């Protein structure tokens, strides 16, 4: 027998309404945004802790700089990636779709590209190597990923494929069929398991770029696994009859992650 979705109100609290220049606004604090905020604060705390233990290699001010540009990279890259990877036809028909943030839509792979761009800038600004920055950031990224998947679950979105497993769940927007709660699988793998893996691995290697490589490898493998039970995007379906867009975008991550881990010591 399928479990019922808990139907948590996605809005925690509403403010207003407010009248500003004849326009009515009713801002709200939503669980989706709140989970990301919690993830951001937790990541900031851990990065500051790492900075305090870095023997002067990092300061808290430099961490704040990194977080600011990293956050911009996630938001801008995530939105642009979502539109280009998953709704390119909408964008061609109406370029303003890119700015319709209120309709939702973020892509991890786009966000990753945005963060990489931010890290390149920080490396240049702080006169570091790129992987010195990336290895600092990689272990805390799963915190934000896990928090975001909890937000997806509360929103009742990005559910899995139809199944008859005992823990299958009926989602309000997923029809009457029981489905995999794939958001929770992603929370467990991309959030908890990946965080523990990176924490363990970062204590056992000093090789520049290896921690970044393990993040790419671990995330890529976990994403490929979960995509086998996650409902493919309706507008894209399956490529070649068996691969989702998420899996296609994860394959280069896996290959490059392996390269970073296995490349000879000292090779930049």
Swiss-Prot record:
Q: Which GO terms describe its cellular component?
A: plasma membrane
Superkingdom of origin: Bacteria
Q: What is its EC number?
A: 2.5.1.145
Keywords of this entry: Cell inner membrane, Cell membrane, Membrane, Transferase, Transmembrane, Transmembrane helix
User: Where does this polypeptide localize?
Assistant: Cell inner membrane
Main localisation: membrane
* PROSITE patterns, alphabetized: LGT
The residue stretches assigned to a coiled coil in this entry are: none
User: How the protein sits in the membrane?
Assistant: Multi-pass membrane protein
The reply on keyword Ribosomal protein is no
Per UniProt, where does a 1,2-diacyl-sn-glycero-3-phospho-(1'-sn-glycerol) bind?
149
Q: Name one GO biological process term.
A: lipoprotein biosynthetic process
Question: What NCBIfam families does the annotation carry?
Answer: lgt
Q: What does this protein do?
A: Catalyzes the transfer of the diacylglyceryl group from phosphatidylglycerol to the sulfhydryl group of the N-terminal cysteine of a prolipoprotein, the first step in the formation of mature lipoproteins.
Family membership noted in the UniProt record: Belongs to the Lgt family.
Protein name, UniProt field: Phosphatidylglycerol--prolipoprotein diacylglyceryl transferase
Give the organism the record lists. Shewanella sp. (strain ANA-3)
């Amino acid at each position: 027998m399928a479990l019922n979705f808990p139907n948590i109100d996605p809005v925690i609290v509403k403010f207003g309404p407010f009248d500003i220049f004849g326009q009515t606004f009713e801002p709200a604090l939503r669980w989706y945004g709140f989970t990301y905020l919690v993830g951001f604060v937790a990541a900031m705390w851990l990065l500051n802790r790492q900075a305090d233990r870095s023997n002067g290699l990092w300061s808290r001010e430099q961490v704040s700089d990194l977080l600011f540009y990293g956050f911009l990279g996630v938001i801008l890259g995530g939105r642009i990636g979502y539109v280009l990877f998953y709704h390119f036809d909408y964008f061609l028909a109406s370029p303003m779709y890119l700015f319709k943030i209120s309709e939702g839509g973020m892509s991890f792979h786009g966000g990753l590209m945005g963060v990489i761009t931010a890290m390149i800038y920080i490396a240049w600004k702080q006169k570091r190597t790129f992987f010195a920055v990336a290895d600092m950031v990689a272990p805390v990224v799963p915190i934000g990923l896990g928090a975001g998947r909890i937000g997806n679950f509360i929103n009742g979105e990005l559910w899995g494929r139809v199944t008859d497993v005992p823990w299958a769940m009926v989602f309000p927007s997923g029809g009457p069929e029981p489905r995999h709660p794939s958001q929770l699988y992603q929370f467990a793998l991309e959030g908890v398991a990946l965080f523990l893996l990176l924490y363990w691995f970062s204590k056992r290697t000093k090789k520049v770029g290896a921690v970044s490589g393990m993040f790419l490898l671990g995330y890529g493998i976990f994403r490929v696994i979960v995509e086998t039970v996650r409902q493919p995007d309706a507008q894209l379906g399956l490529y070649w009859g068996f691969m989702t867009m998420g899996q296609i975008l994860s394959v280069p991550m896996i290959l490059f992650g392996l390269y970073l881990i296995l490349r000879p010591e000292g090779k930049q």
